[in-house]
Amino acid sequence: MDSIGLMVLDMDSFKNINDLYDRSFGDEVLRITAQKVASMLPPNAMLYRLDGDEFGILLLGGDAKEAAHIYGKLQKNFCKQQEYGGKKYFCTLSAGYAAYPGDGSNYLELLKSANYSLEYSKIMGKNRMTVFSRDILADRERRLELLELLRESVERGFAGFTIHYQPQVDTVSGRLCGAEALARWHCTKYGDVSPGEFIPLMEQSGLIIPFGQWILSRGMAQCLEWCRFRPDFQISVNLSYIQLAQGDFISFLRTALEEHSLAPSKIILELTETYLAKAEEDTLRMIAQMKELGVKIAMDDFGVGYSSLFSLKSIPVDVVKIDRGFVKGITSDLFNATFIRSITDLCHDVGSKTLVTQFYHYIFPHFTFL
């Protein structure tokens, strides 16, 4: 036999199905999923259950190309909305693939390599397959080391972290009206580490809770200082969905505002469009509580994810931040210019402000309508 491949499949967000319905329904979803996957496999592939919502596919005599073909069929099928017993649900599949003997000299080593690949698929956004490589192993080792360094930093009072403030300018008056608090990390071993790398690690580990509280408190203190010179100044702070999942966030927010003697209207909390578009009842209730405190809510990265106009109607946001991708070449790109103009007009009509990321001063003359 030329080769043996192992694909490990995991059902994305399966826990949400159990939480939304119940475990008995989840068990039926597992059974249906196994049947569907088995029906789509070639004769040289064997399906077995590994653990929980995780399955293994042993591919005899196949290779990564065949594995990718199999996964492509599965992905196409499971991207669609599923239904059972009158209940609808979504459950995509993530996968990791490894081959014998190159990626493991025995079953346990092969399974470990396939699981590392699956882990990478999850980190990269789920609903995809990753083929094992030494780069994935090196990336995993780096992430584990960065996580330990992050823990050390948090224990040492966020040593190595600084907060930079990106100015926000009113395009009509040209006056500075606020700033966004952006965290930067200079790691003792790796130097400057991108937020795109350390923020997901913090979210996965729970470190985002104390980290988010630290940024918000620092931002409030800085806002209070700048308000001495400009009373209408506001500070924007990014909020992670993990923070909202903690039941005591509203309590922390209220206490922090009181401790800094800061008017709630000076704080804008930013949540991504993708998260808000999928917001459930508990999240919407928390957003309503934040607004009752007087804090403003911004929808970040508008235009990147769902771009649902319904979300502008159903979610009471005060500010819509149009993604920076629409700014590039705006003076010569008719679509981008029209998009920004249309969304701005719509937001004004429903009482929300718009903020365009990286909308530099030399573009102001072309867009005095913001």
Predicted feature residues:
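Conserved long alpha-helical elements within nucleotide-processing catalytic cores of c-di-GMP signaling
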Residues: 1-5, 12-42, 48-52, 56-60, ...
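The catalytic core of metal-dependent phosphodiesterases that act on cyclic dinucleotides
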Residues: 15, 254-330, 342-370
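Catalytic core regions of nucleotide second-messenger enzymes
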Residues: 48-50, 78-94, 122, 191, ...
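Catalytic strand-loop-helix junctions within cyclic-nucleotide turnover domains
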Residues: 58-67, 85-88, 93-110, 135-138, ...
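Catalytic-core segments of nucleotide cyclases and related cyclic-nucleotide turnover enzymes
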Residues: 68, 72, 85, 100-126, ...
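C-di-GMP signaling machinery
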Residues: 101, 120-162, 172, 202-206, ...
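Catalytic core of bacterial c-di-GMP phosphodiesterases, primarily the EAL and HD-GYP domains
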Residues: 129, 171-180, 205-283, 358
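Active-site core of bacterial EAL-family cyclic-dinucleotide phosphodiesterase domains
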Residues: 142-201, 238, 299, 356
